[in-house]
Amino acid sequence: MLPAAAAAASLWAPRLGLRGARLRLARQQVPGVCAARQLSSSSQRRSEALAGAPLDNAPKEYPPKIQQLVQDIASLTLLEISDLNELLKKTLKIQDVGLMPMGGMMPGAVPAAAAAAPEVAEGEDILKQKERTHFTVRLTEAKPVDKVKLIKEIKNYVQGINLVQAKKLVESLPQEIKANVAKAEAEKIKAALEAVGGTVVLE
């Protein structure tokens, strides 16, 4: 039995030795494989991060809500801008459009309100002109060549005045021709006086 066992051992020894060598080689290769996998994973994550980062020269895209808000504001009339300005000042507690932004305010609210202020003021002036129903007709200038015609025309609109008084009136301009006149009549007087060389303003 001993010679048979020795023969079997000598037969399997080379195979066992080869298997052990393979195991040692595999163990040596495992760290390298892991390192390669880590490097590949890190490179992939870096590529994904670069792909997701926005480019500096790419145009900024604004949310639809902001775009719609800008379009709505741009379509407002002067009166609506005035109401918006007033409501913003009340909501954001802005005392003066010239003040620096206070805590809790939207960025750019004060500059936007300040930029809209001249347009709002102009719109309010136009509104006041539209709301007025009575005017004062005032003669401010007269052409020398047309003074005679102008004097006669003034006599038609100023009660109780004679030609001498009308002449003195024309020579000492500006003078009030008629006060508290309805819009239609004021425009009629203005047109008549301007037709004979006068310069008229409605106040």
UniProtKB/Swiss-Prot annotation:
Q: Which domain of life is it from?
A: Eukaryota
Q: How is it modified after translation?
A: Two mature forms are produced by differential two-step proteolytic cleavage. Cleaved by the mitochondrial processing protease to produce the long mature form and subsequently by the mitochondrial intermediate protease to produce the short mature form. In the presence of CUL3, undergoes 'Lys-63'-linked ubiquitination at Lys-155 which results in proteasomal degradation.
According to the UniProt record, which cysteines are disulfide-bonded?
none
Q: Which residues carry this modification: N6-succinyllysine?
A: K155, K167, K183
InterPro entries given in the database record: Ribosomal_bL12, Ribosomal_bL12_C, Ribosomal_bL12_C/ClpS-like, Ribosomal_bL12_oligo, Ribosomal_bL12_oligo_N_sf
Question: In which broad location class does this protein mainly occur, judging by the first location in its UniProt entry?
Answer: mitochondrion
Q: Which UniProt keywords apply?
A: Acetylation, Isopeptide bond, Mitochondrion, Ribonucleoprotein, Ribosomal protein, Transit peptide, Ubl conjugation
Output one GO MF annotation.
Answer: mRNA binding
The transit peptide of this chain lies at 1-39
Its subcellular locations are: Mitochondrion
For the cross-link Glycyl lysine isopeptide (Lys-Gly) (interchain with G-Cter in ubiquitin), the position is K155
* Any one GO BP annotation for this protein: translation
Residue numbers bearing the N6-acetyllysine modification: K130, K143, K147, K149, K155, K168, K178, K183, K190
State the GO CC annotations.
Answer: mitochondrial large ribosomal subunit
What job does the chain carry out? As a component of the mitochondrial large ribosomal subunit, plays a role in mitochondrial translation. When present in mitochondria as a free protein not associated with the ribosome, associates with mitochondrial RNA polymerase POLRMT to activate transcription. Required for POLRMT stability.
Q: What does the subunit section of this Swiss-Prot or TrEMBL entry state?
A: Component of the mitochondrial ribosome large subunit (39S) which comprises a 16S rRNA and about 50 distinct proteins. Interacts with NOA1.
Recorded family membership? Belongs to the bacterial ribosomal protein bL12 family.
Name of the molecule in the record: Large ribosomal subunit protein bL12m
Native species: Cricetus cricetus
